[in-house]
C-alpha cells in the first residue's frame, strides 16, 4: 500500500448517496472537440446528416487514423465552432437504435487476440480515444506503444462515485477490459485502487496497487509518480475504470457501450445521487428539476477541474464521471475577511469553521477576493504529495520559464494534478491553464 499524507479532501456539502438510479431520458448528446488536446478535426458529418451509433463524426488531422464516433444514433443538429473556428461540439438529436457493429468474442478468447486485432477494433469504434498519454494528456498515436498502462479504479475527487460499486456491477466486462489492455503493452497494466476487493485479471502483467490518503491519491498522475515516473522518453497511458468496462463490452458484445454512471451532486442539488446516463448527455436535460432555485453553475466533472456546462458545452464530457453543481457566488460580504467565519472553510484555518470537525460547507463559485500576486505561505506544499518543489514550479509557470518548469517535473503533470494548488492559492492563479500553455510550448519546440 502507498499512503499519501499530503492533499485535501474538500469538505463540500451535497455528497451523493452511493446507490445507482436511472437518469432522465436524454434527447440530445454531443462530442466536445475541445476535450481532445491538440486535435484538429476533419469533419465526416454535417448538420442534417442521419448517423448511426458508432459512425465516424470527425477524424484528427494531426493524429492520422484516430477517429471520433457518435455515442448515439440520430440526426446531427449542430456543429458549434468558436474563435478561429475551433470545434466546440457536434450535437446529435437522439432517435432510433441503429448502430454499427463489430466483431464479438467469448471471454476466454480475448487473451489470445493479437495486438493489431485489438488495436484495430478499438480505433475503428472510436474507443481508442478513451486512452490518454502522459506527458501531454493526448490521445495516443495509432502506431505508438507504451511500457505502462494505468487504470484509475479509484476516485478521490470531491462528490465522486465509489468505483467499486460500478465495477462490481460489470465485473465480467471489467476483467475483459483488463485482458484487452494487457495485450496492448509489453510492460505492465497497473490497476490502482483503494483497499476494497475488485475483480481481477489472471494475466501476469496486470498488477493491483493500493493507494490510500486524501485527494489527489486517486489521480493517474499520482499513481504514475510512485510506480512509473514519466518524462519525454518514458510515456505511459491512462484510462478510467468505466472506459475499461466499455472496452470489455465492445469485444464481448460487438457493440459500442456508451452508458455512464455519474454522480449528480453538490450543495444545490435536491437529491444528490448516482445516475445512469450516457457519454455526451445533455446536462440541461439531466439536471432538469434536480436543482434548488437561484443562479447556479452546472459543471461537467469535478468542482476542482471540471468545465462549465453552458451553451455549446452543456454536455457530459468524454472523460468525466460526475456532474457537480454550485451556487454562483455573486453576493459580497462587508468586511468578510474580518468575520469569525463559522460557516467558511479555510486551508490556513483563518476562520472558525476549522474548529468543527466533520462540518460540510455550502461552497459557491466565489473566489473570495480579486487577483493578486502569488504569495508562497506553504499552502502548495500542504496539498502536493508528489516529490517536487511546487512553489518553485508554479512560480516558473507564472513567469513562463519553460526550461526550469520542465526540469522541475512539469512533464509529469496534467491540469488535474495542480487543481488543488489553484484552490489554495491566495493569488487566485489558474495553474492548470498555465501548465497547459507550458506543455504546449514544450511539445511544439521538441
UniProtKB/Swiss-Prot annotation:
EC number: 7.2.1.1
Organism ancestry: Bacteria, Pseudomonadati, Pseudomonadota, Gammaproteobacteria, Vibrionales
InterPro entries assigned: NqrA (IPR008703), NQRA_2nd (IPR056148), NqrA_C_domain (IPR022615), NQRA_N (IPR056147)
Protein name: Na(+)-translocating NADH-quinone reductase subunit A
Membrane found in the keyword field: no
Known catalytic reactions: a ubiquinone + n Na(+)(in) + NADH + H(+) = a ubiquinol + n Na(+)(out) + NAD(+)
Protein's job: NQR complex catalyzes the reduction of ubiquinone-1 to ubiquinol by two successive reactions, coupled with the transport of Na(+) ions from the cytoplasm to the periplasm. NqrA to NqrE are probably involved in the second step, the conversion of ubisemiquinone to ubiquinol.
Keyword NAD: yes
Keywords: Ion transport, NAD, Sodium, Sodium transport, Translocase, Transport, Ubiquinone
Molecular function, one GO term: oxidoreductase activity, acting on NAD(P)H, quinone or similar compound as acceptor
Amino acid at each position: 500500500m502507498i499512503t499519501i499524507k499530503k492533499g485535501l479532501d474538500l469538505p463540500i456539502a451535497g455528497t451523493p448517496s452511493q446507490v445507482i438510479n436511472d437518469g432522465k431520458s436524454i434527447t440530445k448528446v454531443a462530442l466536445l472537440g475541445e476535450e481532445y488536446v491538440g486535435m484538429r478535426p476533419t469533419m465526416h458529418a454535417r448538420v442534417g446528416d442521419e448517423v448511426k451509433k458508432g459512425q465516424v463524426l470527425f477524424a484528427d488531422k494531426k493524429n492520422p487514423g484516430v477517429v471520433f464516433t457518435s455515442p448515439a444514433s440520430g440526426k446531427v443538429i449542430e456543429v458549434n465552432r468558436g474563435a478561429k473556428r475551433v470545434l466546440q461540439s457536434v450535437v446529435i438529436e437522439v432517435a432510433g437504435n441503429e448502430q454499427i457493429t463489430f466483431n464479438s468474442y467469448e471471454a476466454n478468447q480475448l487473451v489470445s487476440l493479437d495486438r493489431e486485432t485489438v488495436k484495430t477494433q478499438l480505433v475503428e469504434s472510436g474507443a481508442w480515444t478513451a486512452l490518454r498519454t502522459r506527458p501531454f494528456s493526448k490521445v495516443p498515436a495509432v502506431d505508438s506503444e507504451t511500457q505502462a498502462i494505468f487504470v484509475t479504479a479509484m476516485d478521490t475527487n470531491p462528490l465522486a462515485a465509489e468505483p467499486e460499486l460500478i465495477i462490481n456491477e460489470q465485473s465480467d466486462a471489467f476483467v475483459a477490459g483488463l485482458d484487452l489492455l494487457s495485450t496492448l503493452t509489453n510492460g505492465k497494466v497497473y490497476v490502482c485502487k483503494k483497499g476494497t476487493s475488485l475483480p481481477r485479471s489472471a494475466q501476469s502483467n496486470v498488477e493491483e496497487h493500493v493507494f490510500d490518503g486524501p485527494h489527489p491519491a486517486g489521480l493517474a498522475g499520482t499513481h504514475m509518480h510512485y510506480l512509473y515516473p514519466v518524462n519525454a522518453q518514458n510515456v505511459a497511458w491512462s484510462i478510467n475504470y468505466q472506459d475499461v468496462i466499455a472496452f470489455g463490452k465492445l469485444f464481448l458484445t460487438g457493440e459500442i457501450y456508451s452508458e455512464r454512471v455519474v454522480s449528480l451532486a453538490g450543495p444545490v442539488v435536491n437529491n444528490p445521487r448516482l445516475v445512469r446516463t450516457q457519454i455526451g448527455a445533455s446536462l440541461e436535460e439531466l439536471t432538469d428539476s434536480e436543482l434548488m432555485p437561484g443562479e447556479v453553475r452546472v459543471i461537467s466533472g469535478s468542482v476542482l477541474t471540471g468545465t462549465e456546462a453552458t451553451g455549446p458545452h452543456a454536455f457530459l464530457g468524454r472523460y468525466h464521471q460526475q456532474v457537480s453543481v454550485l451556487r454562483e457566488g455573486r453576493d459580497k460580504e462587508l468586511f468578510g475577511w474580518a468575520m469569525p467565519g463559522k460557516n467558511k472553510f479555510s486551508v490556513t484555518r483563518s476562520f472558525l469553521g476549522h474548529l468543527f470537525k466533520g462540518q460540510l460547507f455550502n461552497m459557491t463559485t466565489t473566489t473570495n477576493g480579486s487577483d493578486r500576486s502569488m504569495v508562497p505561505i506553504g499552502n502548495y506544499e500542504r496539498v502536493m504529495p508528489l516529490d517536487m518543489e511546487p512553489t518553485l514550479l508554479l512560480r516558473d509557470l507564472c513567469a513562463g520559464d519553460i526550461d526550469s518548469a520542465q526540469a522541475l517535473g512539469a512533464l509529469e503533470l496534467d491540469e488535474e494534478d495542480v487543481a488543488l494548488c489553484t484552490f489554495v492559492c491566495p493569488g487566485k492563479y489558474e495553474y492548470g491553464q498555465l501548465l497547459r500553455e507550458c506543455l504546449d510550448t514544450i511539445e511544439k519546440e521538441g
